[in-house]
């Protein structure tokens, strides 16, 4: 019983850490302003992402990692 409880706590801690890291990565990418979608892919690639498009005058970067 104690082992399964410990494993559950470790799993939840890992998931929280991953969620926080993804949120920070998204916040960095969201700071890129744009006017049209053609200007986003190069800016997103410079951030380490594979693609991006302009949404609400901010670049939305995809496949970051």
From Swiss-Prot:
UniProt source species: Vaejovis mexicanus smithi (Mexican scorpion)
Disulfide bonds: 34-54, 40-59, 44-61, 49-64
GO CC annotations, alphabetized: extracellular region
Domains as described in the record: Has the CSalpha/beta fold, which comprises one or two short alpha helices connected to anti-parallel beta-sheets stabilized by three or four disulfide bonds. Has the structural arrangement of an alpha-helix connected to antiparallel beta-sheets by disulfide bonds (CS-alpha/beta).
Signal peptide feature range: 1-21
Pfam families: Toxin_2 (PF00451)
UniProt-listed SUPFAM superfamilies: Scorpion toxin-like
Function as written in the Swiss-Prot or TrEMBL entry: Voltage-gated potassium channel inhibitor. Selectively and reversibly binds (Kd=0.77 nM) and blocks hKv1.3/KCNA3 potassium channels of human T-lymphocytes. Also shows a very weak effect on hKv1.2/KCNA2 (Kd=7.1 uM). Also reduces the fraction of CD40L expressing T cells that are stimulated by alphaCD3/alphaCD28.
Subcellular location: Secreted
Family of this protein: Belongs to the short scorpion toxin superfamily. Potassium channel inhibitor family. Alpha-KTx 23 subfamily.
Removed propeptide positions: 22-28
PROSITE patterns: SCORP_SHORT_TOXIN (PS01138)
Residues of the site described as Aromatic residue of the functional dyad: 62
Residues with Cysteine amide modification: 64
Family annotation (InterPro entries): Scorpion_toxin-like_sf (IPR036574), Scorpion_toxinS_K_inh (IPR001947)
UniProt keywords, alphabetically: Amidation, Disulfide bond, Ion channel impairing toxin, Potassium channel impairing toxin, Secreted, Signal, Toxin, Voltage-gated potassium channel impairing toxin
One annotated GO molecular function: potassium channel regulator activity
Membrane-spanning ranges: none
Presence of keyword Disulfide bond: yes
Note: Negative results: has very weak or no effect on many potassium channels (hKCa1.1/KCNMA1, hKCa3.1/KCNN4/IK/SK4, hKv1.1/KCNA1, hKv1.4/KCNA4, hKv1.5/KCNA5, rKv2.1/KCNB1, and hKv11.1/KCNH2/ERG1), and on the tested sodium channel (hNav1.5/SCN5A).
Domain of life the protein comes from: Eukaryota
Tissue spec: Expressed by the venom gland.
Name used for this protein in its record: Toxin VmKTx1
Site positions for Basic residue of the functional dyad: 53
């Amino acid at each position: 019983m104690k082992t399964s409880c410990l494993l559950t706590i470790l799993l939840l801690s890992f998931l929280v850490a991953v969620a926080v890291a993804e949120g920070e990565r998204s916040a960095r990418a969201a700071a890129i302003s744009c006017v049209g979608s053609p200007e986003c892919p190069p800016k997103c690639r410079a951030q380490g992402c594979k693609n991006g498009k302009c949404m609400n005058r901010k670049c939305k970067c995809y496949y970051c990692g």
